[in-house]
Amino acid sequence: MENLMASSNLIKQLQERGLVAQVTDEEALAERLAQGPIALYCGFDPTADSLHLGHLVPLLCLKRFQQAGHKPVALVGGATGLIGDPSFKAAERKLNTEDTVQEWVDKIRKQVAPFLDFDCGDNSAIAANNYDWFGSMNVLTFLRDIGKHFSVNQMINKEAVKQRLNRDDQGISFTEFSYNLLQGYDFACLNKLHGVALQIGGSDQWGNITSGIDLTRRLHQNQVFGLTVPLITKADGTKFGKTEGGAVWLDPKKTSPYKFYQFWINTADADVYRFLKFFTFMDIAEINALEEEDKNSGKAPRAQYVLAEQVTRLVHGEEGLEAAKRITESLFNGNLSDLSEADFEQLAQDGVPMIEMEKGADLLQALVDSELQPSRGQARKTVASNAVTINGEKQADPEYVFSDSDRLFGRYTLLRRGKKNYCLVCWK
């Protein structure tokens, strides 16, 4: 594990991991980092009630800087979340109510907290909310003190909004157009409040970050820096962090630890070593050694298991990881005796297909309702051919009717057809 990375070459180490997309004045920043600890920030807008995988790389980057002795500021956008960032978005965002945004702010702040250390002396993390400075600011102050420093000519040339300005069907509202000023002022404000000298963010944030750098120079005559992390792509060109069911969330109530773990297990060989560099704190030498070992082992690579274990532990803790592994193991070997009621709740949430049934239903009905079989006739043949298990036990009687002993924790019955097709019956 890398502990305190030497600060002066921290940028180099991030580059070796493929974690730097763009950086302003790299030499001056490296020099500034070599002089001693700095404060840096990353902003998270509450656009939903949870962060998702796309937020993980910048969040872990804050952690990497903190491990190297720097002071991270996690900014939750209580104000910017009310406006909506138009950067590279094809259409105007729906405005959310103040109550909703406030609720999301609280959830996201709680989600960010475990990744950073808020009690470690000089470089303890700080949680900030931009509603604190924008909430009471009036429009004249905004236009005179902030707006005066922004050139519309430059703003309309920013890549992030260009596509919206050039389309007749999807223009951009004044609300979203002014987002750039808000994020710019955040940087200037945090520079004044906490001496923040660096902003990090996803590569789509470059335009907002450079605006903040200019504004900080104009308002406070301070030189500050920006660094963006790349947008994560997969080798096959498909979007990272999405499954058939949508985004992969960090909130266990939205994506269960089991589903989260499985997401990483299913990483392609072409991506897995790169992802170990992005999403874990393993030493690069260790990752390269693992790649070498996988290449020469003649067996299935071990890297996916290492990745799944590391990231699940980071996000869901030891307990979440243990549950995910326990469920994975039980489904693989068909022995459900180790599963807890909470494990079944994870499976019902998003782990395997799930149906609800009234008590008194028979096995054939369950196979048809669960779409494990197209018809009762086909189900009858499948059961008779010994291809169906109930809670891991073979059941070859086509006339079988479920009994209370089949209902684990009084509620759950796991059906399997063949090797891999599962359905969880939840009894009403």
Curated annotation (Swiss-Prot):
It is an enzyme of class 6 (ligase). Homodimer. Signal peptide: none annotated. Its EC number is 6.1.1.1. Residues 361-418 form the S4 RNA-binding domain. GO terms for molecular function: ATP binding; RNA binding; tyrosine-tRNA ligase activity. SMART domains: S4 (SM00363). Pfam families: SYY_C-terminal (PF22421), tRNA-synt_1b (PF00579). This is Tyrosine--tRNA ligase. It comes from the Bacteria. ATP binds at K242. Keywords: Aminoacyl-tRNA synthetase, ATP-binding, Cytoplasm, Ligase, Nucleotide-binding, Protein biosynthesis, RNA-binding. It comes from Klebsiella pneumoniae subsp. pneumoniae (strain ATCC 700721 / MGH 78578). It is found in: Cytoplasm. SUPFAM superfamilies: Alpha-L RNA-binding motif, Nucleotidylyl transferase. A motif ('HIGH' region) lies at residues 46-55. L-tyrosine binds at Y41, Y179, Q183.
